[in-house]
Amino acid sequence: MNHPPPQAPFGRRRLLAGAGAALMVAALDGCKAVAPAPEPRPRPAPDPVLKLAPLRASTDRITQVTVCTRPFRAQGPRLDVERIGQKNIVHNYGHGGSGWSLSWGSSAIAVHKAMTFGEREVAVIGCGAMGLTSGLLLQRAGARVTIYAKDLPPNVRSSLASGIWSPDSRICFEEHATPAFKQMWASMARQSFQTYQSLLGLPGNPVEFIDNYFVSDTAGAARRGPAPEDSRPKFAELQLDLLGDLIPRGEPFGPGTHPFRDRYLRRSSFMMFNIAPYARLLMSDFLANGGKIEIAEFHSPAELATLREKVLINATGFGARALFGDESITPVRGQVARMIPQPEINYGLFYKGVSFLPRRDGLVFQVVGDDDYYGFNDDTTVPDRAEAELAVNTIAELYKTA
């Protein structure tokens, strides 16, 4: 709630005007004495408009540092059908940093294509964001489904994501964002967004909305994109133009209206995925609906011939690069530092190229860099402790009082 500004102090001009009027009354009355005006009591400084619970950002509270390899394709996700031997394979991979965000819409496209073959037994390869949503949507379409996967959550790449609604994050290069692609992408994003609304408020909060604060030391600062002289291709940015009605309007806060001293803030709201309970919910629903999960590892498409199902959905994410020899996949490294949860923290932060998310399954700190080329074409998966501590210490700066 906005507090009214403090009253102006009892200044010299006002005091003199009051004294002059009192003397005039005394002269006219000839007998009345006028008491001097009382000194005003000092008013306390107004409270900040924003009251945010303090974050205990300290490197000794880090519990885990993990690295995720995002599967970027310059032309966008692969959703075509390929026939290999006697198998019809529907591909559903290559979503960059948008996997969880687009999973329901993208998997709906893959499932529609898979069901056109008329088979009632369908296999899914992979048990991450795309694999689980493909399996559930196949069941809803009437299929009997088995998921074959080398690893299960939480030991899949999808479980190592930051957990933010980011449907156009490294989705493709700008030159490949044709009108047809934009239409498909918007459809996937909207279908996913609407599905997520049905998951709000469930036990464990698998999906929830949070307020996020972009913090800067100067007014009007924003995350920088590639420099004008940068000759590298630009990543497509689609959300503002095509999903503008789903994006709440931002709200600015100047110095003195928040706990972060003389900095500038802009508040926005977006969805966040608490990935551990969310993945558990998807797996539980899949198994409860009669789905089967088998541990299996495939090294080439030829090995898929051993499966009894004639129709398969390939949801192997970055794994498709090795399994199907898809060299169009470029790895994008993303590291997060996890920290002991603080249930009272219900807001996110972005400051100096570092993102903080208040996930209930562990607070998340991530260096995201100045632009989307940060971590591009880097397939290293060894955690970098120095980068993790940099992320935590950067956010910790906001809570220093001196």
Walk through the language-model features, giving the residues of each.
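Flavin (FAD/FMN) cofactor-binding and adjacent substrate-gating region
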Residues: 18-20, 59, 65-86, 158-160, ...
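Glycine-rich active-site loop/strand segments that organize a redox cofactor
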Residues: 152-188, 242-249, 255-256
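Short hydrophobic core segments
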Residues: 310-316
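Active-site substrate-recognition segment that forms the wall
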Residues: 38-85, 94-100, 108, 128-143, ...
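A conserved short coil-to-beta-strand element within the FAD-binding core of flavoproteins
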Residues: 292-305
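N-terminal secretory signal peptides
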Residues: 1-11, 21
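Short beta-strand to alpha-helix junction loop
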Residues: 98-102, 180-188, 266-281, 382-386
